[in-house]
């Protein structure tokens, strides 16, 4: 029946023929049909052009031919408003992406947003395509674009536990304190101590509270009775006297759960009773003065290595 329908509809027959050629990587047939006048910008029922199709299938040579014959990479499909670059990001097709990014359309596609406000960088971070993330940033993609829900690529990488993408984005100065400190609080809530340590080492603000209740990372550590997180936060300068919207300090939160002895409660009682020593106060202040984006330059300071290591918290017993 389909064959009969195709015979009566030559346009559909041509569409299926060129799609089959792309799927098979038959560049000769693709080129021949384009030279005979077939448009590379025709769209199927899903709004896909041949560029969408070949990018998703990983057919690099076909992508090159389509671009040579005027394919438009700015076209968005009808599924989610995705460009061919979004699909290349989804499947990690970095070589194909480079072809599109080296075209005259680069500025129009590199930060193009889907119907949900996702850029190709959102997609690459979500799927953990670290080489693709690097490529987009090499071509100067915006590092902190916001989706319609206010989410950045870094947040997606954290939630999906894409560690390599997280590090790459942070190395390119992604905002570690986005959404009033979401990342550090998320790491605490998930008891992800490696992320928690990474964010603190890179200068995350320890005292930013949730907008809905004012709970800081230290409050959340108390709620979870996570003494390791609490120690890390305290060592990096978390204020034990910060209050949530109910007027509770982290210690008060810990006591409200249970007054009986527990590791986190015992620790909070200990550090709340006595002030920080001058040495630790100096470290906290120096790191603040150096600033978030310059902490990675600590090694360039004209000071003794032991001081650099101290500023990096290398002697912490956690």
Swiss-Prot record:
PROSITE patterns in alphabetical order: ANK_REP_REGION, ANK_REPEAT, SOCS
Gene3D superfamilies registered for this protein in UniProt: Ankyrin repeat-containing domain, SOCS box
CDD domains the record matches: SOCS_ASB7
ANK repeats: 13-42, 46-75, 80-109, 116-145, 149-178, 180-208, 213-242
First and last residue of the signal peptide: none
Keyword Repeat: yes
Pathway terms, separated by semicolons: Protein modification; protein ubiquitination
Domain of life: Eukaryota
Keyword terms of this UniProt record: ANK repeat, Repeat, Ubl conjugation pathway
Written domain comment of the UniProt record: The SOCS box domain mediates the interaction with the Elongin BC complex, an adapter module in different E3 ubiquitin-protein ligase complexes.
Function: Probable substrate-recognition component of a SCF-like ECS (Elongin-Cullin-SOCS-box protein) E3 ubiquitin-protein ligase complex which mediates the ubiquitination and subsequent proteasomal degradation of target proteins. Plays a role in spindle dynamics and genome integrity by targeting the mitotic progression protein PSRC1 for proteasomal degradation in a cell cycle-dependent manner. Also participates in meiosis by mediating the proper attachment between kinetochores and microtubules.
Designated name of the protein: Ankyrin repeat and SOCS box protein 7
Organism of derivation: Macaca fascicularis (Crab-eating macaque)
């Amino acid at each position: 029946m389909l064959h009969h329908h195709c015979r009566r509809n030559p346009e559909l027959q041509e569409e299926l023929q060129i799609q089959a050629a792309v799927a098979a990587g038959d560049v000769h047939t693709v080129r021949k049909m384009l030279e005979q006048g077939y448009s590379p910008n025709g769209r199927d029922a899903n709004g896909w052009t041949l560029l969408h199709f070949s990018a998703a299938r990983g057919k690099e040579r076909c992508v090159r031919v389509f671009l040579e014959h005027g394919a438009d990479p700015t076209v968005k499909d009808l599924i989610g408003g995705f460009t061919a670059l979004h699909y290349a990001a989804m499947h990690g097709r970095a070589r194909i992406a480079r072809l599109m990014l080296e075209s005259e359309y680069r500025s129009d596609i590199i930060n193009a947003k889907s119907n949900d406000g996702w850029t190709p960088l959102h997609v690459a971070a979500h799927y953990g395509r670290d080489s693709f993330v690097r490529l987009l940033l090499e071509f100067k993609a915006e590092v902190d674009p916001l989706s319609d829900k206010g989410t950045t690529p870094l947040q997606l990488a954290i939630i999906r536990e894409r560690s390599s993408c997280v590090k790459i984005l942070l190395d390119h100065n992604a905002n570690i304190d986005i959404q009033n400190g979401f990342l550090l609080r998320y790491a605490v809530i998930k008891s992800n101590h490696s992320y928690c340590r990474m964010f603190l080492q890179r200068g995350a603000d320890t005292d930013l509270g949730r907008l809905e209740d004012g709970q800081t990372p230290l409050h959340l550590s108390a709620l979870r009775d996570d003494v390791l997180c609490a120690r890390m936060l305290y060592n990096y300068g978390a204020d034990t006297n910060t209050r949530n919207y109910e007027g509770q300090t982290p210690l008060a939160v810990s006591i409200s759960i249970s007054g009986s002895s527990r590791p986190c409660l015992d620790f909070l009682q200990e550090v709340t009773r006595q002030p920080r020593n001058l040495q630790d106060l100096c470290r906290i202040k120096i790191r603040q003065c150096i600033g978030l984006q310059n902490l990675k330059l600590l090694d360039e300071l004209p000071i003794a290595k032991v001081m650099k290591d101290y500023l990096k918290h290398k002697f912490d017993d956690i």
